[in-house]
Amino acid sequence: MTPLDHIRNFSIIAHIDHGKSTLADRLIQTTGGLTAREMSEQVLDNMDIEKERGITIKAQTVRLDYTAKDGQKYVLNLMDTPGHVDFAYEVSRSLAACEGALLVVDASQGVEAQTLANVYQSIEYDHEIVPVINKIDLPAAEPEKVKQEIEEIIGLPADDAVLASAKSGIGIDDILEALVKRIPAPKGDINAPLKAMLVDSWYDPYLGVVILVRIIDGSLKKGQQIRFMQAGTTHLIDRVGCFRPKIEILDSLGPGEIGFITAQIKEVSQTAVGDTITDAKNPTSTPLPGFKQVQPVVFCGLFPVDAADFDKLKESLGKLRLNDASFSFEAENSAALGFGFRCGFLGLLHLEIIQERLSREYDLDLITTAPSVVYHLNMTHGEGSIDLHNPADMPDVTRIDSIDEPWIEATIYVPDQYLGAVLKLCQDRRGIQKDMTYVGGRVQLLYELPLNEVVFDFYDRLKSISRGYASFDYHQIGYREGDLVKMTIMVNGEVVDALSMIVHRHAAEGRGRQMCQRMKDLIPRHLFKIPIQAAIGGKVIARETIGAMRKDVTAKCYGGDISRKKKLLEKQKEGKKRMRQYGSVDIPQEAFIAALRMGDDS
């Protein structure tokens, strides 16, 4: 075991694409964790999606041995944390496992919204934060301006910020020295009962569930009986080790150390992130603070384009859940789309990642219904309140007293030339402006928004109106009552359940008209007229009609009596009327997919 004063636990906080994973690679290379031949780009990002999108999804850890300039040997534990808002809870647990953080800011881009959220969390944990200004070798780099931003926006002294370029290897030694000198050593008591935090877990086909732990007090050894305090389950440890970044098996882990254990656990859902691990025979009296059960925030339906793929989809979702307990799914049946699953996600990025992994790793073609959030329905006649996940399941309006919807607080950074467009977008989405601050050439906006308005296409719209320069971060602030209604779309008088949605009463007409217009453009013409209607309850609020294809039944009448033509036209009219009653409208898959991707022109 390493003495406490020679351990440093730190995480790297950075916005997407500011060079976090590249910096981690350089630190591993410099301390000799891997030889030059073994180095691959972004060692800690294992999934292809992580590498391609330049994001980190799961927390990873690596132990580095570093000999400082004063000749002392130190063990540095690097926690590579996710940077995205959907994984905010995973981030908070990873940060809680450390004593300090490197704040990496791109010298050409400056401070962004996600950086801020994680920095404030780190400050709450009383961490020592070392600012690192990365990419200083870029032609557009402005290190002095970025230093000023760090001081003005975050309130951290940045005069001793380390200037570096992870790609070129500039300033890496300065970063390592700053870690040793400025980040405090962990505290802990080896003789106290075992207390360790479960930081993250993932499924390995050979080892079962691998659990990432940070020891607070006591020690962990192979063969020890441990207990998860929140889950209440006991397990026998069969492996203890750490990542360098290759797996290294150890005899034990002591206070302040970060490593992994395996205990023949088969499902990730048994290991909740943030749980306290203690000794089964000699338990600690109090669990660690801050534990939360992660709840899905955004729901949507996933349906296979080919109905024969249903079993394959079910199996694929099961495999993904092995590695991601925060994702939930249950079977559902839709009259329009057939059999599929209703899935719950932490947020929009989470939904996108799962969708992309299903199509890429499992080769599935999917239709995704419009994402929706969880509404609280307060019922009349003392029925209490129920949670609504799927708009199609909404009970009769007469039984509902009021509907509460989730709200978020959003922080938006935008260059001042795009401010007007962003303010209009937030206003259109029922936003309430809380604060507006000018920092240099950029504006920091604080808005309260209904989550329902954000999940649809807010992020894409924000990026397009600001030419990609705006950054956005949010957290939930609770539920508020809203004037919400269920809007259904009817084609030829029949309700299409997959297109039902809950909207604000004021936005219903515009959204309904848009939906009908889009369906009109996409459904092919039939031999009879097809009405497409958007309705709230029994009231139709928008309508479009697809004209019938006309066959010229009078073509064979040359001259002659007009009554002959009239008779044929009347006969055709009767036939069309009968057709409209009994004919079924064929809605192509493309129409569904396009109607559900409303965001393109809203």
From Swiss-Prot:
Give the InterPro entries listed for this entry.
EF-4, EFG_III/V, EFG_V-like, EFTu-like_2, G_TR_CS, LepA_C_sf, LepA_CTD, LepA_IV
Enzyme class, broadest EC rank: hydrolase
The record describes its membrane topology as: Peripheral membrane protein
Q: Which GO terms describe its cellular component?
A: plasma membrane
* Residues bound to GTP: 17-22, 134-137
Write out the entry's keywords from A to Z: Cell inner membrane, Cell membrane, GTP-binding, Hydrolase, Membrane, Nucleotide-binding, Protein biosynthesis
Q: Can you say where in the cell this protein is located?
A: Cell inner membrane
Query: What's its EC?
Result: 3.6.5.n1
The biological process GO terms on file are:
positive regulation of translation
Q: Give every tr-type G domain span.
A: 5-187
Keyword Protein biosynthesis attached: yes
MF terms from GO for this chain are:
GTP binding; GTPase activity; guanosine tetraphosphate binding; ribosome binding; translation elongation factor activity
A Pfam family reported for this protein in Swiss-Prot or TrEMBL = GTP_EFTU_D2
Describe the reaction catalysed, as an equation. Answer: GTP + H2O = GDP + phosphate + H(+)
> What is the similarity comment for this entry?
Belongs to the TRAFAC class translation factor GTPase superfamily. Classic translation factor GTPase family. LepA subfamily.
Q: What does this protein do?
A: Required for accurate and efficient protein synthesis under certain stress conditions. May act as a fidelity factor of the translation reaction, by catalyzing a one-codon backward translocation of tRNAs on improperly translocated ribosomes. Back-translocation proceeds from a post-translocation (POST) complex to a pre-translocation (PRE) complex, thus giving elongation factor G a second chance to translocate the tRNAs correctly. Binds to ribosomes in a GTP-dependent manner.
PANTHER family the record matches: TRANSLATION FACTOR GUF1 HOMOLOG, CHLOROPLASTIC, TRANSLATION FACTOR GUF1-RELATED
Q: Report the protein name in the record.
A: Elongation factor 4
Native organism:
Zymomonas mobilis subsp. mobilis (strain ATCC 31821 / ZM4 / CP4)
Q: What is the lineage of its organism?
A: Bacteria, Pseudomonadati, Pseudomonadota, Alphaproteobacteria, Sphingomonadales
